[in-house]
Regions:
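Phosphate/nucleotide-binding beta-alpha loop and adjacent structural elements of enzyme active sites
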Residues: 2-230
């Protein structure tokens, strides 16, 4: 889905959402031009975490780090630090140019050190480890799992926000994640209307004491807040 369509969706959802969640809606209205996210994931994160400054993030499937980024605003205005994971070589140059976050180029899966193919699509935002209809290039890369990624970049055991948007293997990433070792405050996870995957994600998040929030607004995502967050 292109950026123009997302803009229309954002405006439509915002108008309806305003009447149900006034405080959050006001925050979005004031800051909507600063948001780079598809559907205000960055603003939702800030609102739920009390507009925290100097937080930490992991963005898995970061695109070019600017357009449709869930962490650009967090880094630039709120001084957050973290890691952007993006295997697409076309996007990596822009991340290195425009972001302070560390860049991980290996695909994130449920296994470390496995050689797999990564497929570039015409639209870089659709590139993934799963072969799509409009593949224009492919190359082999070694994988890394989320647990090792966090350890590699010394992010710490408390992580404020993890965004997962990998065009298909979101559940596989989560099922091997050490929820007991790492205390995450907020997740945004793309399901892209795959009901089977969505159900599996919901089960694993509920099992690990996460509560789904703002179902109406999350559209192609599901958003989960740690139940320990007040």
């Amino acid at each position: 889905m292109n950026i123009k369509i997302y803009t229309i969706i954002k405006i439509y959802l915002l108008l309806i959402f305003f009447f149900q969640y006034r405080k959050l809606a006001n925050f979005i209205l004031i800051n909507k031009t600063l948001s780079k996210s598809q559907i205000f994931q960055d603003l939702i994160c800030l609102h739920l975490l009390n507009y925290k400054k100097r937080g930490t993030f992991v963005e898995i499937g970061g695109g070019n780090g600017v357009d449709l980024s869930n962490t650009h605003l967090l880094e630039k205005k709120y001084n957050w630090k973290g890691v952007i994971c993006e295997p697409d070589k076309r996007s990596q140059k822009k991340i290195l140019k425009n972001r302070f976050a560390k860049l991980e180029v290996k695909p994130i899966t449920n296994k470390c050190g496995k050689q797999i193919y990564f497929y570039e699509e015409e639209d870089p935002y659709l590139s993934s480890i799963k072969k799509g209809k409009n593949k224009i290039n492919s190359y082999k890369l070694k994988t890394i799992c989320l647990n090792h990624l966090i350890s590699k970049y010394k992010i710490g055991n408390i992580i404020d926000y993890i965004s997962i948007d990998t065009e298909g293997n979101e559940f596989e990433i989560l099922k091997k994640f050490n929820f007991k070792k790492y205390n995450v405050n907020f997740f945004t996870i793309e399901h892209n209307f795959n009901l089977v995957k969505r159900k599996k994600i919901k089960q694993i998040m509920k099992k690990n004491k996460f509560k789904q929030v703002y179902k109406f607004l999350s559209y192609m995502d599901d958003w989960y807040i740690n139940t320990n967050i007040k």
